[in-house]
C-alpha cells in the first residue's frame, strides 16, 4: 500500500511578532478522510495545536498562525503516522538590514595534457549535463547563473580563470576529450556549446548589471601561499595573476578588482603581487587567518584593512554548514527546511554584525555533486536564493557585492601563512608516498624554468606549462594525478633542455690565440656569461647571442684553460666545463 506523504511550507522564513504566517500543507496518498495535527513547537514544547481535515486522495490545505514572541520555532504537520516540520523565525525587523556577502568558488582545473587532449570533461559536463534531473536539466555552473538571474540576489562568484579558459577553448577551437577507447572531438558547432555560451553570457550580463560580483584569480589555481614560501616563484605568480585577470576580462568582459586566493592559502609574500596587480579585496578564513586577532564574537564580521587590501573573513561555521551538512537533503521537504535553517543561522548573527558584514565563502559546485550529483542539494540552492530575495524585500538582509564596501574597522598587521584547512598537509603529506613524487617533479620543473628564463628571458609557453604543473587540484590527497603533473613537468624540463642544448661552443686557434665561438640555435636570444680560467687568472665575459647567430671571443694562449658556459645572474653551469690542455713538447 502506498504510504501517505506530507509536505509543509510557509510563505516566508522570517516574520515579525504577530505577523500572519501562511501555512500550506499538501497530503497525498489518502484512502479516507483523516485528521492533520498542525502544531507550533518551540524548544521541543508545543505552543499551539489545531486539527485540520484532509480529504482523499489528496488535499492541499492553507491555514494561518500567529506567533507573538521572538524566537525560532518549528511548525509541524502530523497525519497517518507521518510528520514533517519546517522552521520559522520570529524576529523584529532591524533598523538596517544585515549586510551579507555570499561567495561561491566555481572552479575546474584545466584537465588537459601537453598533447592537447583533455583527460577530464568536467568544465563542460558540469555546465551542460542534466546532473540534477528530474528537477533541473543543466549542471551546477549554468544552474547558478540561471538562479541568480531569476531571483536577482547579489552573489559574488569566483569563476576561476581556469574554468573560463576551458569554456573559451571550446568556443574557439573545439576540444578533444579522452575516453576509455577513443578520443571524442566536440566542435564549437556542437548543440551543447549553446549552454556554455548561455553560462558565459548570463554571468557577464549579471556582472555588468551590478547583480553579481566576479572575482578573478591566478590562471591555473596554484597553492600560491605555499609555493611562494617554499619555492619563491614570485615571477611565475605575478604572471599567473596577470594572465588570470586577462582571461576574466576577455571571456566575461569584467575588470575584476577582487580575487579568490586558491585554497585560501595566504602568505605575506603575496601581498605586493596582489597590490601591484590592482587587487582591492580578498576573502580569508575566519578560524585560521583571523586567529589570535579575534577579540569577541563580532571580530569575524568586521571589515579589515591590510596594506592595499580590504579583507573579509568568512564565517567558517556558516560556510561549512552548507558545504557539509545542509547539502545532504534527500527530498524536497528537507531541501526547503535546510534552506530555512541557513537563513535562520544567518539572522542569529545580526547582533554581532550590526555595523559589519557576514561573509559566507565556499565551493560553488562540490557540495551539490560530490560524491554524486544530488538534485535536492541543487533545489536547496534555489530555495536559499528565493528566501534571500524575500528577506531582502522585507528589510532583514541586504546581500551586497564586496566592491561596494568603502569603510573598514581595523588594520590587521599580520596574517598567518596557511590555508582554509589550517596547514598544507592535504597537498603535501596526507599521501606522502605519492605527493612527495609530485613535488620532486615540481621542484625539477621549477629549477629548469628558472635557468631557462635566466638565459632566454620570459617565455609564455614555458610559464603556462609550469603553471599547469603546479595546479593545486592535482596534489590534493583524494585527487592526486601523477600523469598530469608528470607530463607537464616533463614538458617544462624538455623544452628548457632543448633550448639549453641548442647553445653550442666551438674553438679555433690562430697565431697562438684561442677563438671561442658561442652559437645559439634557439628561437630566442641568449644572455650568457663565459667563464675562462687559467692557472693564473679567472675572467668572465658577458655575451648576448642572438637567435640563429654566434658570438666570438679571443683569448691569448690556451694552456690549461677551463671554459664554462654560465647563466648571467646565478652563474649556474649550463653544461660541464670544458678543459683544454696543451701538451708541452720536449726537445
Predicted regions and their residues:
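Short, hydrophobic beta-strand segments
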Residues: 62-69, 553-558
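Active-site and substrate-binding clefts of carbohydrate-active enzymes
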Residues: 16, 93-152, 161-164, 170-186, ...
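Terminal connector regions
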Residues: 70-92, 557-586
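Metal-dependent polysaccharide deacetylase catalytic core of the NodB/CE4 family, i.e.
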Residues: 161-261, 307-327, 364, 406
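Short proline/glycine- and polar residue-rich coil/turn motifs
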Residues: 52-59, 543-550
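Catalytic domains of cell-wall/extracellular-matrix polysaccharide-remodeling enzymes
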Residues: 239-295, 366-387
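Structural beta-strand segments of beta-rich domains
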Residues: 19-23, 512-516
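Asparagine-centered strand-capping/turn motif at beta-strand->loop junctions
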Residues: 27-29, 518-522
Amino acid at each position: 500500500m502506498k504510504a501517505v506523504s506530507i509536505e509543509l511550507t510557509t510563505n516566508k522564513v522570517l516574520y515579525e511578532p504577530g505577523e500572519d504566517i501562511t501555512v500550506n500543507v499538501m497530503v497525498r496518498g489518502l484512502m479516507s478522510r483523516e485528521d492533520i495535527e498542525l502544531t507550533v513547537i518551540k524548544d521541543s514544547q508545543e505552543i499551539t495545536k489545531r486539527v485540520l481535515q484532509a480529504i482523499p486522495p489528496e488535499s492541499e490545505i492553507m491555514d494561518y498562525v500567529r506567533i507573538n514572541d521572538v524566537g525560532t520555532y518549528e511548525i509541524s504537520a502530523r497525519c497517518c503516522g507521518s510528520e514533517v516540520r519546517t522552521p520559522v523565525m520570529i524576529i523584529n525587523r532591524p533598523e538596517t538590514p544585515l549586510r551579507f556577502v555570499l561567495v561561491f568558488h566555481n572552479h575546474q582545473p584545466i584537465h588537459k595534457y601537453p598533447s592537447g587532449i583533455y583527460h577530464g570533461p568536467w568544465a563542460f559536463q558540469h555546465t551542460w549535463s542534466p546532473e540534477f534531473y528530474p528537477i533541473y536539466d543543466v549542471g551546477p555552473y549554468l544552474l547558478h547563473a540561471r538562479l541568480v538571474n531569476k531571483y536577482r540576489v547579489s552573489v559574488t562568484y569566483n569563476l576561476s580563470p581556469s574554468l573560463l579558459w576551458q569554456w573559451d577553448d571550446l568556443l574557439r577551437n573545439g576540444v578533444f576529450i579522452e575516453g576509455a577507447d577513443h578520443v571524442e572531438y566536440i566542435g564549437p558547432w556542437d548543440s551543447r556549446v549553446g549552454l556554455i555560451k548561455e553560462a558565459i553570457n548570463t554571468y557577464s550580463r549579471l556582472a555588468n548589471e551590478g547583480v553579481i560580483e566576479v572575482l578573478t584569480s591566478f590562471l591555473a589555481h596554484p597553492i600560491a601561499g605555499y609555493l611562494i614560501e617554499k619555492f619563491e616563484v614570485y615571477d611565475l605568480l605575478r604572471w599567473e595573476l596577470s594572465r588570470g585577470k586577462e582571461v576574466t576580462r576577455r571571456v566575461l568582459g569584467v575588470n575584476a578588482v577582487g580575487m579568490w586566493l586558491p585554497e585560501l592559502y595566504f602568505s605575506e609574500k603575496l601581498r605586493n603581487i596582489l597590490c601591484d596587480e590592482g587587487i582591492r579585496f580578498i576573502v580569508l578564513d575566519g578560524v585560521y587567518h583571523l586567529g589570535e586577532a579575534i577579540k569577541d564574537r563580532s571580530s569575524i564580521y568586521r571589515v579589515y584593512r591590510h596594506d592595499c587590501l580590504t579583507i573579509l573573513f568568512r564565517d567558517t561555521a556558516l560556510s561549512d554548514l552548507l558545504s557539509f551538512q545542509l547539502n545532504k537533503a534527500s527530498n524536497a521537504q528537507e531541501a526547503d527546511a535546510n534552506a530555512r535553517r541557513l537563513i535562520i543561522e544567518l539572522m542569529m548573527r545580526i547582533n554581532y554584525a550590526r555595523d559589519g558584514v557576514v561573509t559566507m565563502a565556499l565551493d560553488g559546485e562540490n557540495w551539490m555533486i560530490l560524491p554524486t550529483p544530488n538534485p535536492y542539494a541543487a533545489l536547496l540552492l534555489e530555495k536559499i536564493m528565493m528566501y534571500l530575495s524575500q528577506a531582502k524585500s522585507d528589510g532583514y538582509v541586504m546581500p551586497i557585492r564586496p566592491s561596494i564596501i568603502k569603510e573598514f574597522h581595523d588594520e590587521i598587521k599580520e596574517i598567518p601563512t596557511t590555508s582554509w584547512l589550517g596547514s598544507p598537509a592535504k597537498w603535501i603529506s596526507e599521501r606522502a608516498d605519492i605527493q612527495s613524487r609530485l613535488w620532486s617533479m615540481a621542484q625539477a620543473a621549477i629549477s629548469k624554468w628558472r635557468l631557462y628564463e635566466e638565459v632566454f628571458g620570459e617565455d609564455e609557453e614555458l610559464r603556462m606549462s609550469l603553471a599547469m604543473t603546479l595546479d593545486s587540484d592535482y596534489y590534493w590527497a583524494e585527487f592526486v594525478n601523477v600523469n598530469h603533473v608528470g607530463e607537464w613537468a616533463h614538458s617544462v624540463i624538455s623544452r628548457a633542455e632543448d633550448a639549453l642544448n641548442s647553445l653550442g661552443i666551438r674553438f679555433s686557434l690562430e697565431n697562438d690565440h684561442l677563438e671561442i665561438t658561442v652559437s645559439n640555435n634557439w628561437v630566442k636570444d641568449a644572455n650568457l656569461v663565459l667563464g675562462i680560467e687559467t692557472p693564473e687568472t679567472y675572467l668572465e665575459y658577458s655575451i648576448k647571442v642572438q637567435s640563429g647567430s654566434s658570438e666570438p671571443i679571443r683569448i691569448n694562449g690556451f694552456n690549461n684553460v677551463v671554459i664554462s658556459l654560465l647563466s648571467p645572474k646565478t652563474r649556474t653551469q649550463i653544461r660541464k666545463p670544458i678543459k683544454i690542455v696543451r701538451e708541452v713538447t720536449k726537445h
